[in-house]
Design a protein with these regions (language model features):
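Bacterial N-terminal signal peptides that target proteins for export
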Residues: 2-13
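Bacterial N-terminal signal peptides
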Residues: 11-21
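Flexible, surface-exposed loop/linker segments and immediately adjacent secondary-structure boundaries
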Residues: 25-69, 73-160
């Protein structure tokens, strides 16, 4: 007859679990609350660079501050941010979501897009309506302070 192994968790293990489990849950909540928008429409191929990894995206994919979106050839992406800003990217385009804040209750507004190459249609949302000075669109040649409601932009690839 074999002896049964009885496991009694140590106090250190229980203390570690009490600290770690709420921290892990808070981390998951913060990931959800850091979503700044989503991919509403996708045709062809597209990817997002998040950190150092490029991964394919699909319609409905969440977007985060710091993401870099790339469309393939052929490819097109429609993006909607949480303030109702809409951005359409044409084939062979690249855009970085550099800065974003939309917290009307705290009067926190920021929108900084870096359009790297390709074609874009941009329709402003609530950030421009509530705090026009908080929105900027950067291109390789200029920075645009957005005050209107619609922009169409074409950026050719830089030749060295």
């Amino acid at each position: 007859m074999e002896a049964a192994l009885i496991y009694k968790p140590s106090s250190a293990f229980l203390l570690a679990m009490l600290v770690c489990v709420p921290a892990m849950a808070a981390n998951e909540t913060s990931k959800t609350s850091d979503i700044i928008g989503h991919v509403q429409h996708l045709t062809g191929s597209a990817s997002v660079v998040r950190g150092s990894a490029a991964v394919p995206i699909a319609a409905g994919a969440p977007l985060y501050q710091g993401d870099v979106l790339r469309t393939g050839k052929p490819g097109a992406v429609g993006v909607v941010l949480t303030d109702a800003t809409t951005i359409s990217m044409g084939s062979g385009s690249e855009m970085a979501l550099n800065d974003y804040a939309f917290a009307p209750k705290d009067s926190k507004f920021a929108l900084a897009l870096k359009l790297i190459k390709g074609s874009f249609a941009y329709v402003t949302g609530q950030i421009v309506k509530l705090s026009p000075e908080s929105a900027q669109v950067h291109t390789p040649d200029a920075t645009i302070a957005v005050r209107g409601t619609k922009l169409l932009i074409q950026i050719d690839e830089m030749k060295e």
